[in-house]
Structure formats: C-alpha cells, structure tokens
Design a protein with these regions (language model features):
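N-terminal cap/lid segment of alpha/beta-hydrolase-fold proteins
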Residues: 29-72
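Short beta-strand element of the alpha/beta-hydrolase
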Residues: 74-82
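Conserved acidic catalytic loop of the alpha/beta-hydrolase fold
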Residues: 180-201
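Gly/Ala-rich beta-loop-alpha elbow adjacent to hydrolase catalytic centers
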Residues: 203-212
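Catalytic active-site module of serine/aspartate enzymes centered on a nucleophile-bearing elbow/loop
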Residues: 317-343
Length: 343
C-alpha cells in the first residue's frame, strides 16, 4: 500500500516538475534574443516616367524590409497594413508585435508598404495632403476602441490608462488612397514582390485585404491570405452583393479568373464588438459571402470570430492588441493546418 502511495507521489512530483520545466522553457523562449541570419530592404515594382530630354522619375513602387531568422520556415509572412506598417511592429503598449512573435516562431517576416504609402510614397501622380482635425476621434471608433470617443468598450484589449499608448496609436497613420485604381496598382507591385521572394502568406488588415486578394490573381507565389477585419472583396461576375463600386469595391472579375482564389487557403478574422461601432457588421456579412463564393467553386476560405475561440475585447487591429500572442496562436494553427509551417 505504501509502495502504491509512493509511486503516486513520485508520479505527481514528476508531472509537476515537467510542467514547471515546460513553463520555464516557454518563458525563456519568449524572452530569448531573436537570432537573425539575414536582413535588408528593397523597392519593387513601379514605373519610370521620362521626357523627351531624357530626364526620368522612378515612382509607384512598393517598399519592403525583411528579417530572416536562423533555420527559417519555408513560407514567408508578408505583413500588409493599409494605415501604417508600424502596427505590425509593436503591441499597443510597446510590447512585442507580430514581427517579433513570428520571427521567434521561425518565419521570415517582410513588412510591406505599398505604392504611395509610408516609405513608398514617391508616386507617379500628384497627391494633396489636407490635415483632418478630428481624425484621432474618428480612429477611436473606426478601430473599435469604443462606440464614441472617449468612452472605451469594457474589456477592450487596449491599455486604456496608458496615455502614451494612445499617443502612439494616434500617430500610427499615413495617407490612404482607397480607390480601386490604387488597389490594382498596389497589387501589381505586391505580385512582383511575391515573385521575387517566393511562396508567402499575406497577413493583412482592413483595406489591405482586398489588395492581397487582387495580388493572388496576379502571382502563383501567394500561398495563403489571412485577413484581419477586411473591408473589401472580389467576387465572380454577377455574384457580388451589388451596389455602387467604391474605394473598397466590391470588385467583380470573370469566373475563371476568380477561380484562381480557390488555389490557396484564406481566413478572415474578426474581433469583438463588431456590431457596436463603425460599419463592420456589413463588412462581416460580406466576408461570409466571399467565403461562400470561394468555397462554392472548390476553394478553402473560412471566417473566424475571435470571440468564438474565447478571445474577448479585440479591436479592429487584433494583432496589436494586448492579447496578441493568443491571436497569433490562432494564426499558427491556421498555418499548421494548411502545411504552411514546414521548415
């Protein structure tokens, strides 16, 4: 009898030690230095304008910086925002963002600025910037921090007492050019990026998603798309939601062209409170329609509500939220499910 009890105690002790060891290992991994074997940056795509005198202007290109970790996985992650690439770099409070999280997980990470925005703003056409007083308050509701400034949603995944976090978030913007023409131009450059770097999964946010969908029609090197809170879609001719085409579509293409989207897995991810601020309820319904059309023709598209997997309070930019590691875990599951995590 005593021997049985001793064995039980020993078993419990071993289990406890293994749990502590695993926890310590994971903690050490999270805080360990990130080892990079290669990093750099380059412009890609674009045009060259010229005149009769031989003068020229390089313009309408995209710009990317990248880091490749030691012993990288085979598929790159291209992080594509529509408002500011900085959203991929940090959590709202300055903690680790998706760039660092996925470098630690072994993925080559590319931070992308499409033509005309951020570090690629040398355009071939004239643009005018007009300061918009009140944009900060507009961001508050558009990013679903709350239904009305300055009233935060209860449990929102933002450090609401951190004034510097709000200051940094308010400065994480640059001009957006939300037209179908611009979306096509950006996808032209992005397709050239994919062809240069090889098989990649595009991670997008907001208007970036429609641009990545268009990119998939122009390259065979887009291995998947994960769209965080996408607001624009592409449909087969005659099967879209109808209505006037605006900056976020809807765009319709011939069925045979649309079927290219059935060759890669796609996931549309949504945060919390989508029915309480902005026009996200409609965007959510459009994501369901898009998935329905892709799957109708043999594709693999899914819609994930983070609340359905127990994640509460996420904003329009969940990969920068305070629980972004848990959000990243959902992405890791998607990548593994589709064989996109191989080394």
């Amino acid at each position: 009898m005593n021997d049985t009890n001793d064995r039980r105690r020993l078993g419990l002790l071993v289990a406890l030690l293994l749990a502590v060891t695993a926890s310590s290992y994971l903690g050490a991994q999270a805080n360990a230095p990130i080892t990079i074997q290669k990093q750099g940056s380059f412009a890609v795509g674009g045009k060259i304008l010229g005149d009769a005198e031989g003068k020229s202007l390089h313009c309408d290109h995209g710009y990317v910086d990248y880091q490749i970790p030691v012993k990288p996985r085979r598929v790159n992650l291209v992080m594509w925002h529509s408002a500011a690439a900085t959203a991929w770099l940090n959590r709202w409070d300055g903690g680790e963002g998706y760039q660092s999280i996925f470098l630690r997980r072994g993925y080559p990470v590319y931070i992308w600025d499409g033509p005309h925005v951020g570090r690629a703003n040398w355009g071939c056409t004239e643009n005018t910037y007009k300061p918009g007083i009140g944009r900060d308050q507009g961001n508050f509701t558009a990013w679903r921090f709350g239904a009305q400034y300055p009233n935060w949603f209860e449990g929102v995944q933002f450090p609401t007492k951190n004034e510097e976090a709000w200051n940094q978030a308010s400065r994480a913007r640059y001009l957006e050019f939300d037209t179908v023409v611009n979306a096509q131009m950006q996808s032209d450059a992005a397709a050239k990026l994919m062809d240069k770097i090889g098989p990649s999964v595009a991670l997008t946010n907001s208007a970036g998603g429609m641009r990545a969908i268009l990119t998939a029609l122009k390259t065979n090197n887009l291995a998947g798309i994960v769209m965080y809170e996408n607001v624009g879609y592409v449909y087969p001719e005659g099967e879209g939601p109808g209505g006037t085409v605006g900056g976020f579509g809807p765009i319709e293409v011939p069925l045979e062209e649309f079927k290219k989207l059935t060759k890669l897995p796609m996931q549309m991810v949504w945060g919390d409170n989508i029915d309480k601020a902005g026009n996200y309820s409609n965007s959510y319904k459009l994501s369901q329609l898009f998935a329905e059309k892709v799957n109708k023709y043999g594709g693999n598209a899914e819609v994930l509500k983070l609340t359905d997997v127990g994640l509460k309070g996420n904003t329009h930019i969940p990969f920068a939220d305070m629980n972004n590691v848990a959000v990243a875990d959902q992405l890791s599951k998607f990548l593994a499910k589709h064989g996109l995590d191989k080394r």
